[in-house]
Amino acid sequence: MSEARKDTVTVVGAGLVGSLLSIYLARRGHTVELLERRPDMRRETVDGGRSINLAISTRGLHALRQVGLENEALKHAIPMRGRMIHPPQGELVYQPYGKDDSQHINAMSRGWLNAFLMTAAEATGKVRIRFKQRVTDVDFGSGALTVHDDATGEARQEPGRVVFGTDGSASAIRQALEKRPDFKGTQEQLGHGYKELTIPAGPGGAFQMEKHALHIWPRGTFMLIALPDEEGSFTCTLFLPWQGPVSFASLDTPAKLEAFFGAQFPDAKALIPDLVEAFFSRPTGSMVTVKGAPWHAGGQTLLLGDAAHAIVPFFGQGMNCGFEDCVVLDQLLGQGAGWEQVFTDFERLRKTNADAIADMAVENFVEMRDSTGDPRFLFRKAVEKVLLNAFPGEFVSRYSLVSFSHVPYRLAYQMGALTDGIVSELSEGLPRAEDVDLKRAAELIRSRLTPFMKEHADGFRTEG
């Protein structure tokens, strides 16, 4: 069995997760055929429709560290130490992400990271990437694939091998699995779409807003965000409902767009010189939450990343979760079991965690657009900050558990509900955050959080 496990395997999808997975598999001794539907993004312009920037945090960096790629990747990252809230009127409001500046997330170019991982995969000498290869069918008995070569127009059979589906939220491998009678799943489209815009660098390549922050313009049913780029620019993303009084459907003329931005985002509008041209020429992206099971067909096929569990982008964890998939799979491969056992264990370990971060991402969307500018929300955040400083190691925010630890997502979700309850109780009737009753806080923390952390000690002891 151990010898057979070193056979050639097929990975479908050379995006972020597929490229990193190929590196992990190569390091385990496998030869990898990596099939990618798109052209080689390193040589041709690719219209992927995906966001230009992403946020990489502790889980994703850990996955890169295991294969020796973290340091190089961080050379191309910009630390974001908190949210910078742009209210409709008044002063900017800064909300730090962690207990201090050491806890930050990192803005990085999706395209740069994808190209970097492709090149690193090829550098193993055991990964061959074949582009313009579109999978149209899977034989789950043998692992044989029907592949359409978009360069030649020809279809052919790819030999039967173990197959990993990392081909994104519209995964061809998952769609084939969905035809099996044992598959149960849902796909929930968010009622909002997104459009990317750019704030260019200022004179001399200077950033025109605070560099080390994720900027948010929360406006209730819609919002604008901006992440810093290496070149001094900011990639902005406008999230709007598809339909309604304020929506992509309603902003159908340059005049309406200009008036909308002038009223809602005047400071951003002043920094986006090509607003009208960019808005009407760039694609509008959709967002989906994918849940389903099983993720595997015996020991022949396994889904990872967005193919298994696509989530909306509002916790910055889609890629981080997919990279963590690679780490968990690699750990299971190191235990020497056969493929079917590895795949079964992988799904058991990852499914509940993927569902948890999917739910948290939707909740964070509501928080970002509705609450980040709400005085009551800001007051609760101030109380939370007092508790974080007064009870280090005992009181931990959900955001910190998700972004700055390896605690399983499901435990972070459950712990977050407990901490929210404590903050709500302590905030009630409080005139100032610094007046929080620390004695009462200690009682609540030690009666609710401490027992939970002890009960799940293994999860809170994960490698950091």
Curated annotation (Swiss-Prot):
Pfam families: FAD_binding_3. Keywords: FAD, Flavoprotein, Monooxygenase, NADP, Oxidoreductase, Pyridine nucleotide biosynthesis. Pathway: Cofactor biosynthesis; NAD(+) biosynthesis; quinolinate from L-kynurenine: step 1/3. Belongs to the aromatic-ring hydroxylase family. KMO subfamily. Its EC number is 1.14.13.9. Catalyzes the hydroxylation of L-kynurenine (L-Kyn) to form 3-hydroxy-L-kynurenine (L-3OHKyn). Required for synthesis of quinolinic acid. The keyword Zinc does not apply. It comes from Myxococcus xanthus (strain DK1622). GO terms for molecular function: FAD binding; kynurenine 3-monooxygenase activity. This is Kynurenine 3-monooxygenase. InterPro entries: FAD-bd, FAD/NAD-bd_sf, Kynurenine_monooxygenase. The keyword Lyase does not apply. It catalyses: L-kynurenine + NADPH + O2 + H(+) = 3-hydroxy-L-kynurenine + NADP(+) + H2O. One of its GO terms (biological process) is NAD biosynthetic process. Its cofactor is FAD.
